[in-house]
Amino acid sequence: MSGRSIHIFCGTGMGKTSAALGKGIREAGLGKSVILIQFLKEKQAEGSMDFFKRLEPEVRLFRFEKFPENYDCLTEREQEDEVRNIKNGLNFAKKVLAIGECDVLILDEILGLTEKGIVTIDEMRSLIDAVGDDTELFLTGNCRCEELWPYVDEVTELVTPYKKETNAE
């Protein structure tokens, strides 16, 4: 990678996180530093966390949510607490961009924060605007957030294919 670039991986299909992480790992292999911040994700299995620890210091993973359950399964009170934690994660992302702490920043499932009303499109735009000249930013999530498309370099929409069953003849 050379220069500033911003990518969105969106849609209802599987593989958005894998695609962004794959690009991040490729860049880490080229000597770049990568930060992955996860939002709205259930707590990962212990094996997944061990894998990410082996990628350090080139790839660093951060989660600010404290509850192991999916956000939608939390009580209203727990969701309020979790929103504060998520906002801390957003502030961390802003700081990472402001000081140029990494070459590649992956904000996993951040697009879903707009659907839940936790983050506005304007706040997302300010994150995009904060991307430095030599930073690559990946935004993932189910939400298409088409309002952001004019401000990014690449949009990849993943859709899980529908396979029509046919009767054997």
What is each PLM-predicted segment?
Residues 40-43, 67-68, 111-112, 143-146, ...:
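Conserved nucleotide-binding/hydrolysis micro-motifs of P-loop NTPases
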Residues 73-133:
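Phosphate-binding/switch loop-helix module in NTP-utilizing enzymes
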Residues 2-5, 133:
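Catalytic phosphate/metal-binding cores of nucleic-acid and nucleotide-processing enzymes, i.e., regions
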Residues 26, 51, 127, 147-148:
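Hydrophobic/aromatic ligand-binding patch that stacks against planar heteroaromatic rings
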Residues 4-95:
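Conserved P-loop
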Residues 30, 128-129, 164-169:
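P-loop/Walker A phosphate-binding loop and immediately adjacent motor/lid segment at beta-alpha junctions
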Residues 142-169:
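Phosphate-binding/switch region of NTP-binding enzymes
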